[in-house]
Amino acid sequence: ADGVRLAHASTVAKKVVMETPEEYLRKNGSYCIYARKAPCAVDTAAVRRTVEALVRQQVPFDFNFDHSSAKALYCTEFVVHVLEQNNCFCFSRLRKRNYMYPNDVLKIISTR
């Protein structure tokens, strides 16, 4: 996977990081990787800039799993936040729940 980088909210690093798939798999005891087409039109360059900014800002992992604020992000919240920052609000309805699970995102994608 030359040049491929995964961006995610890492419980190991305790912040948003970007790393190779090999680094991700080596550092994480449990993992799931979803490669799906965005369910709405997005500017991939803008999404990348948003992700790179979160990495630069060293946004911490949200161990409280509180998606009412973007001061810290957990895995699924990271995906929803990045897309919302780029005018893709298809997952925003998940914010009405106490917790947003990866499966919730997959269900929305599969119905589109």
Task: Give each language-model segment a name.
Residues 1-37, 61-73:
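Glycine-rich catalytic cores of cysteine/serine-nucleophile enzymes that process amide/ester linkages
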Residues 3, 44, 104-105:
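Short linear motifs in intrinsically disordered/low-complexity regions
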Residues 10, 55, 82-83:
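Hydrophobic aliphatic residues
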Residues 40-42:
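Surface-exposed beta-loop interaction hotspot
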Residues 52-60:
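The feature captures the short pre-catalytic strand/loop hairpin that immediately precedes
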Residues 66-112:
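Activation targets extended, charge/polar-rich intrinsically disordered C-terminal tails
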